[in-house]
Amino acid sequence: MYRWLAEKLGNVSVNRKLSIGFGLVLVLTLLITFTGWTGLSGVISRGDKLGYISSLNGLTKDLRLARLDFEMRRGEQGTSAVNDLITQLDSGLKTAADLIEQPDDKLVVEQQQDALGQYKKAFGAMVQAGLKREGARSKLGDTADNAVAKINEVEKSLLQGDSVTLFNSVVDLSKLIQQARFQVRGYTYSGKVEAEQPALDAIDNALKKITDLNDPLPEQYRANLQEASVSLQAYRAAVSQYRDSQVASAAAMKIMGEQGDILLDRSNKLTTSQTVVRDTDAAHAKNLLLLATALALAFGVL
């Protein structure tokens, strides 16, 4: 073949040979350039995708920190920090779903989107539980204050009378109410489940004392006793409301913790997978460039 090509070229003029040679060099140069450019573009694209996925990983970690801060401060700083990060991550995952081509990796992104949806729902539930908890706190203060005020009126009136026994009984009731408030405060400040029942028992003791005083006390004091009893019953209901909000908040936090772990796990898995894709594309581009170079050298020898 080489001899045949040499004979053919021997019949071609020098200018034509130079033109053919220059054209061949130009074609081979363009081939190498195109191969290199295509490979480089692919690697850059994969690198950009990997960088974008890494930014989502960072957002996921920021979301966890913001959620922990929200829990620690009991929502004092508001919900904007967590909600903003949820919005950013949701938008980022939608973009990632469009950027990623591999079916398995698309499935991973869908799992992240599902986890984020459940995370968002759980956070909303936790916020609502927090609002109910603070509402219960407010009721606790108002109802207890009203009960104390009504009993104090009775106590002051009896202090001016002659019945020491009745006065001491009302003083005992005041002490029971104060004991109930002490137990309830211990429960609400600690949030410990085991502190709830002692608080309820203390309230029940005060309610029983009011019932016991209904007959011995004169008729004029029974309206105050009745109002104090109603306030203590509302006080007890507020303790139960506080408990329910605590249970709801704990359940929401558990879900958020689980979904947050899924988000981080899938994000790491996606990063690893896309790194492999990038490295594979880089190796493929390198092989294409080597092939184009080898072809150029082969034509050059010919």
Give residue spans per PLM region.
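Extracytoplasmic
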Residues: 92, 135-171, 209-211, 215, ...
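Juxtamembrane membrane-water interface segments immediately C-terminal to a transmembrane helix
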Residues: 37-68, 76, 80-83, 87, ...
